[in-house]
């Protein structure tokens, strides 16, 4: 985090951006705030962060950032940057401490965007994810809701109502406002359906999750969960990360569509299933559940298997090959089922009984 911050101060950037850092002990989130300025905050151990495409860190402890730096870091000139550009939007009567001693400085208010576009593109996605993660801790809907889809003060992080699983992450990154009037596949009014940008959107190429498992030996600790194509219809596959090569099913993606490649097979599944969402829903759900269950089973086998003294990476790569073979088999079966339903639903279908 500090190294990237120093590079940022030296070279700068032309846009705001964010990046997460993690090891087995902690997670930090760094945000560039334009030019040569940056902030970073340690994610509390019992909290989750929800980050759409906008500046996200809300409350920032400037006292810690310029003091012990236990949970907050920033560029050295941040205080002068705030002061010289009049970015402290706290009302004078509310500011009872010097800026350098402020423990709850609102970075999102000072540096972030609050555009109308955010209220269709960003805040609704954060609202849906936070609503899923903490459904009982806050009121999310109705006239007495604490947080609504277009609010600018949605929390950057919160304590979820329960522990978060890999499957939860996949569901959220595939979501399209299920159970709300805003679901483009749902039964809401035309004015509400498609009102907000879904999280699982058609142009997604891949999604990944890095899982660090402290209960495993170091060589097997890191697992990368990968899905390719549109998240609504694809499946999460686990792979050992401590390897020097990737299974050909994933690594040999060409420019032309090919059903023998994970990416293209999933792109085809998504394109076919989208127009027949209800008819293919069962096949998609079975596909996603089968890959997740069989992937976990193979991962558990690999976790228990002995590794050679030499060639650890290749041994784990061979387990990845087994997992990729399973994923290919399940993907081909899903493609066949989706193609069958889509073919039956073509507009030029006709039966003798229709005459």
Please describe what each predicted stretch is.
Residues 35, 46-47, 216:
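Coil-to-beta-strand transition motifs
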Residues 2, 42-60:
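Catalytic or ion-translocation cores adjacent to nucleophile or general acid/base/metal-coordination motifs
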């Amino acid at each position: 985090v500090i190294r990237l911050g120093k590079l940022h101060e030296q070279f700068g950037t032309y846009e705001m951006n964010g990046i997460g850092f993690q090891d087995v002990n902690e997670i930090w989130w760094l945000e560039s705030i334009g030019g040569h300025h940056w902030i970073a905050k340690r994610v509390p151990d019992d909290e989750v962060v929800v980050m759409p495409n906008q500046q996200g860190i809300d409350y920032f402890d400037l006292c810690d950032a310029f003091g012990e730096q236990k949970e907050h870091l920033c560029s050295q000139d941040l205080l002068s940057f705030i002061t010289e550009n009049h970015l402290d939007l706290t009302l004078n009567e509310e500011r009872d401490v010097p800026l350098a001693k402020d423990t709850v400085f609102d970075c999102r208010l000072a540096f972030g965007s609050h555009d109308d576009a955010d209220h269709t593109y960003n805040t609704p996605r954060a609202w849906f994810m936070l609503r899923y993660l903490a459904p009982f801790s806050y009121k999310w809907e109705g006239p007495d809701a604490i947080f609504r889809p277009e609010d600018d003060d949605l929390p950057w992080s919160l304590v979820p109502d329960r522990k978060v699983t890999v499957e939860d992450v996949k569901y959220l990154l595939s979501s399209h406002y299920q159970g709300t009037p805003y679901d483009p596949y749902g039964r809401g009014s035309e004015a509400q359906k498609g009102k907000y940008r879904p999280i699982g959107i058609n142009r997604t190429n891949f999604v990944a999750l890095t899982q660090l498992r402290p209960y495993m030996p170091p060589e097997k600790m890191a697992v990368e969960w990968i899905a390719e194509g549109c998240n609504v219809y694809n499946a999460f596959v686990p792979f050992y990360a401590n390897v020097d090569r990737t299974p050909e099913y994933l690594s040999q993606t060409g420019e032309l569509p090919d059903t023998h490649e994970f990416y293209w097979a999933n792109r085809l599944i998504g394109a076919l299933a989208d127009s027949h969402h209800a008819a293919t829903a069962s096949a998609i759900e079975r596909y996603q559940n089968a890959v997740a269950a069989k992937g976990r089973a193979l991962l558990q086998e690999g976790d228990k298997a002995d590794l050679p003294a030499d060639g650890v990476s290749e041994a784990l790569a061979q387990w990845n090959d087994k997992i990729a073979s399973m994923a290919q088999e399940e993907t081909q079966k899903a493609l066949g089922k989706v193609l069958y339903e889509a073919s039956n639903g073509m507009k030029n279908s006709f039966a003798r009984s229709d005459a």
